[in-house]
Curated annotation (Swiss-Prot):
Regions crossing the membrane: 12-32, 74-94, 108-128, 131-151, 183-203, 242-262
Any one GO cellular component localisation term in the record: plasma membrane
Protein known as: Maltodextrin transport system permease protein MdxG
Protein function: Part of the ABC transporter complex involved in maltodextrin import. Probably responsible for the translocation of the substrate across the membrane.
SUPFAM superfamilies: MetI-like
Complex formation: The complex is composed of two ATP-binding proteins (MsmX), two transmembrane proteins (MdxF and MdxG) and a solute-binding protein (MdxE).
Keyword Thylakoid among record annotations: no
Amino acid sequence: MNASTARMLNKICTYLFLTLLSIVIIYPLLITASSAFRVGNSAAFQLDFSGSWTLDHFKRLFDETLYLNWYSNTLVIALSVMVLQVTIVTLAGYSYSRYRFAGRKKSLIFFLIIQMVPTMAALTAFYVLAMLIGALDQYWFLTAIYIGGGIPMNTWLMKGYFDTVPREIDEAARIDGAGHLRIFASIVLPLVKPMLAVQALWAFMAPFGDYLLTKFLLRSPERLTIAVGLQSFISNPQQQKVALFAAGAILAALPICVLFFFLQKNFVSGLTAGGTKG
């Protein structure tokens, strides 16, 4: 087999894989859109774009359910987790990357050990703790768990990314009279924008997709998040509200999509700045 034939086969396999992957991703989206916009109440998810389309399911979502409460609850939690977690892991990652202090290596290893414990293994402990301190049905407790759960691995990731920024940049800035805060905020931080964008997106997405924690810790129907609220539409096999579920799922994806497109420029600018400074 010559080189040109090998390249052609490689290209065919690549396109075939990407086509199959696209089908796997797009097909469920089409089913969801079909169920959300099709007239009538379907008893099951179906890919059927025939007939009339309507926005009534979206209207019913806000008029007949607590979806607006769930939506606002999730946004508040997601924004809080994103801001606080990104701030904490950025400062922690920078500290581990640039400074040497007592217990540095041991604490990094401890972070890895904590990360090995699955969330499901701690559900009972979270519930008991919430009962003891009166934190059941409280957003601050749920937010704290999300933040704490994301700190160990994300601190490692941020440290690794800070390590890629040459220390010569810090030394040059220090010679010019820059202090620690200025070096961090004005010089190093712009170079790690790609990882900051990834961290922000991950932290923001977590409350939208989590079901177990909110199911355990939130009790009042009006204080639920989107994941638990939407599940209630299809939890009863005798009265499944597939159309409402699909409409709610589409709206739930919008904030994540908006944030992704908003952060895209940070990927590009951060990578460009890194190439220029390095």
